[in-house]
Amino acid sequence: MSRHGPQSATSAQALGAGSALVRPHEMVDEIGHAGSKSALARLNEAMAEIKALSMAPLLQRAIDAIRADDHKTATEWALKALEQDDQSGFAWYTLGIAREKAGDFASSISAYESALRLLPDHAEVANDLGRLAFRMGMLEQAEKLFLHFLARHPGHVEAVNNLTCAVRAQQRYDEAIEILRPVLLRQPDSAMLWNTMASIVAEQGDYATAKLFFQEAVQLDPGFFKARYNLGNCLLMLGETQAALDACDEALKGVRAEDERQMMHMARSTMLAGLGRLGEAWDEYECRLHPRFAEITYFVMKGPRWAPGMDVKGKTLMVIGEQGLGDEILFANPLGELIEDLGPDGRLVIAVEKRLVDLFQRGFPQATVCSHITGAIGVRPARTVPEEVDISDVDLWTPMASLLRAYRRSVEDFPANPTGVAADPARVEVWRQRLAALPGRKVGILWKSNITKDARHRYFAGFDAWAPVLSQPGVTFVNLQYGDCAEELARAKAQFGVDIWQPPGVDLKQDLDEVAALCCAVDLVVGFSNATFNIAASAGAPSWLITIPGSWPRLGLSDRYAWYPQVRVFGLDRFGDWGPVMGRVADAVGAFAAEVAAEA
């Protein structure tokens, strides 16, 4: 980009904002498109006002290029117009549309802001800027921009829908429903509004009702492919995995925007995994590396990237961890076999989050383990290794999850005794001695994720659902939950009469070596899949997993967990109905405690 508008607080924040609001299994919003027919029509009307200016033909060519989806050419003509008059709001607006459609959000948001400053009465600019802010996860700014547009266009259906999406994404569900309800009552034939209402209901965990609303949207508009995709995600959460995949495949037939297509490919990969079609799933999962995938992480590495089928014997191969802590541990499942394939003359270099380095080094002593670092390219995260790490002899490199394409193409490919991370034996013994002073079986528990910004809470039982588990006699419960859990610990004491033992002197989020040792020292770990659960299970601790329908890491299995063979699975029968499964967990914990009592 050769020109940039003045940077405001909004554009400055964009440079550090998350890329996208929507994740796989999350619902996608219909908030309209920059450069829509109505927006381009208004631009054409504006051309009449500036037709006497020399830039008019340049802008017309830019608009024609946008219509033809030629965003590069549109950008070039808009920049030529700005070279003649950099105070033309319409030229900045045209540039903003072109850059947004090209996926260059940082430049786009700057251009839109310049347009809004120069065209304060052209409310369509505020609407487009709001949509872009929404796509980048800048929800408060998006809400204000949609309100600005509605002040000029009260009752505008699309703008009301957009505002609802912004409010809902901030988890203000009741407020979102109240904004949307009167408009939906006036226009009950609007598929867009039914899709948004369904998304609100789904985020609150009522997938059965959401399914009906998404079906209504699809029935009203069979060509509304985003609603069809959302229906697929809803079906997945209800355990209807094949129907979910069918809906996703239908949606892909009609979606043109590349970022939306890649998002759907990501969801499709997890649906395939949930059906046990692992080879297809991992091949599809490569979409996470597509440049138009909204949550891409760039890997900044020199040399060729490894691909399935390459002969690695005698090579030096670098594997880079990706996504969250739990993912880095989960996706490490094939590393043991990779080391065998490299042979005695080969070398494996593993780059992981710095808190995991010692755990990986103990688990894979033949490898060289270092930390990775994450910066940014534009608004996208970029991962590499520190300069002090010598990788001059690396022959090949790969993101860690890509190894699944070669080593885990079926459930049968998962070994009975996989190599994983390893706790410090000396620290395990220290914790065992401390725990020996406590009565009964020692059961570590995990009940939530620390991530709340994307409504992930609905994947975890509320703390009250743990009451039957915590009431089991003959057990000392040990807190393994990282993050702020003081309220839950106090409630356990006040409401259930249970003192959950808090490990002294340990930061359960940062001191992962101690966490691993503690997990291996207790008799059992029980909880949901988060970073700590993956550490415990990978290190070989006896572990019980509570999981929801549609959870792709189950790989279509109901009675076992292929990643960690010792894990016992307790699956939800129906999304949101935590009572039965927590009852089964409680009975199992009681039986587990009774075994020791009987032996004594």
Question: Where would I find each of the regions flagged by the language model?
Answer:
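Alpha-helical solenoid repeat scaffolds of the TPR/TPR-like class and their adjacent stem/linker regions
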Residues: 1-524, 532-533, 537-600
